[in-house]
Amino acid sequence: MNIIQQLEAEQAAKIEAKRTLPEFSPGDTVRVNVKVTEGNRTRVQAYEGVCIARSGGGLQENFTVRKISYGEGVERVFPVYSPMIESVDVVRRGKVRRAKLYYLRDRRGKSARIVEDTGVRARKLNDAERAAVAEEKARIDAEKVAAAQALAAEKAAAEAAEAKAAAEAAAAAETAAE
């Protein structure tokens, strides 16, 4: 492995640690949550459409998503490892026999539909995705519980310190009164 590939692998691993993208291919309907910065505000915008192509490799890998917005076809190219992509959700799996679905640009209506894939591979991928989402949710819930317990312990320690200080002040007042 040369130095460039090694650096790319390290960067890809760093980005994968922050967020993991599901396995998807051309023909799948995906929802891409993109961070949009307007002035000094940042918000998340969902872009849902059909993945019509995946190209490149390594850190330069891209995927193209096409949707019909107000009767007009809109395509957007997203880098897979972009920090602006918050998450990608697979809405449904498509059954296609091409790697590039550029022919959809010329189609309208029913001829532009993609048949849903209900095969074993699609079910396996969907089950794996659901398991990964459930695992991530369980991890986040565990973190929330741990944070709540730490906060409760901190509050209890603060209250105990206050009670101890009040008891010492009362004892000091009694000795001063005698």
Curated annotation (Swiss-Prot):
HAMAP family: Ribosomal_bL19. Pfam families: Ribosomal_L19 (PF01245). PROSITE patterns: RIBOSOMAL_L19 (PS01015). This is Large ribosomal subunit protein bL19. GO terms for molecular function: structural constituent of ribosome. InterPro entries: Ribosomal_bL19, Ribosomal_bL19_CS, Ribosomal_bL19_sf, Translation_prot_SH3-like_sf. It comes from the Bacteria. The lineage of its organism: Bacteria, Pseudomonadati, Pseudomonadota, Alphaproteobacteria, Hyphomicrobiales. NCBIfam families: rplS_bact. Belongs to the bacterial ribosomal protein bL19 family. Keywords: Ribonucleoprotein, Ribosomal protein. It comes from Rhizobium etli (strain ATCC 51251 / DSM 11541 / JCM 21823 / NBRC 15573 / CFN 42). Signal peptide: none annotated. GO terms for cellular component: cytosolic large ribosomal subunit.
